[in-house]
């Protein structure tokens, strides 16, 4: 029976490591829900002043998304 216990513990150790790798590479939020503050500022600026005048807010939102794990 000791052989079965060792085998079971080895199998249970493999599963969490796979889950940890998956959660590290996958963003926790959907991109539409990440960084609501910078998204709001960016959108309001674009509506009022046009995209070319809002590069500061666009870049701030992109940096925020990248910090959340999104590749944009």
From Swiss-Prot:
It is found in: Mitochondrion intermembrane space. A motif (Cx9C motif 2) lies at residues 54-64. The keyword Chaperone applies. Copper chaperone for cytochrome c oxidase (COX). Binds 2 copper ions and delivers them to the Cu(A) site of COX. It comes from the Eukaryota. Gene3D superfamilies: CytochromE C oxidase copper chaperone. Belongs to the COX17 family. GO terms for molecular function: copper chaperone activity; copper ion binding. The gene is COX17-2. The keyword Electron transport does not apply. Residues 32-72 form the CHCH domain. This is Cytochrome c oxidase copper chaperone 2. Disulfide bonds join 35-64, 45-54. A motif (Cx9C motif 1) lies at residues 35-45. Keywords: Chaperone, Copper, Disulfide bond, Metal-binding, Mitochondrion. One of its GO terms (cellular component) is mitochondrial intermembrane space. It comes from Arabidopsis thaliana (Mouse-ear cress). Cu cation binds at residues 32-33. InterPro entries: Cys_alpha_HP_mot_SF (IPR009069), Cyt_c_oxidase_Cu-chaperone (IPR007745).
């Amino acid at each position: 029976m000791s052989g079965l216990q060792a085998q079971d513990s080895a199998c249970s150790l493999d599963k969490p490591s796979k889950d940890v790798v998956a959660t590290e590479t996958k963003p926790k939020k959907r991109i539409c829900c990440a960084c609501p503050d910078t998204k709001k500022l960016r959108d309001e600026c674009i509506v009022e002043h046009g995209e070319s005048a809002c590069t500061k807010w666009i870049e701030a939102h992109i940096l925020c998304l990248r910090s959340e794990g999104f590749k944009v």
